[in-house]
Amino acid sequence: MAKGKRTFQPNNRRRARVHGFRLRMRTRAGRAIVSARRRKGRDSLTA
């Protein structure tokens, strides 16, 4: 039985557009994510 293709095809532009800082800052929920990660002391806040 054949396996499907690998689903993770890395692409830096798509990564930034989907999970980036500017996108997170657009919504209230996104800002909450960033502030929670700041509070937790994460080295990396967003992708």
From Swiss-Prot:
Q: Which InterPro entries match?
A: Ribosomal_bL34 (IPR000271), Ribosomal_bL34_CS (IPR020939)
Q: Which residues cross the membrane?
A: none
Q: Which keywords fit this entry according to its UniProt record?
A: Ribonucleoprotein, Ribosomal protein
One Gene Ontology cellular component term attached to this UniProt record is: ribosome
GO terms (molecular function) for this protein are:
structural constituent of ribosome
Question: Looking at the keywords, is Ribosomal protein present?
Answer: yes
Asked whether the UniProt record includes Ribonucleoprotein among its keywords, one would answer: yes
**Single Gene Ontology BP annotation:** translation
**Lineage: superkingdom:** Bacteria
HAMAP family in the record: Ribosomal_bL34
What PANTHER family does the entry give? LARGE RIBOSOMAL SUBUNIT PROTEIN BL34M (PTHR14503:SF4), MITOCHONDRIAL RIBOSOMAL PROTEIN 34 FAMILY MEMBER (PTHR14503)
Q: Which family does it belong to?
A: Belongs to the bacterial ribosomal protein bL34 family.
Q: What is this protein called?
A: Large ribosomal subunit protein bL34
The protein's organism comes out as Rhodococcus erythropolis (strain PR4 / NBRC 100887)
The top of its lineage is:
Bacteria, Bacillati, Actinomycetota, Actinomycetes, Mycobacteriales
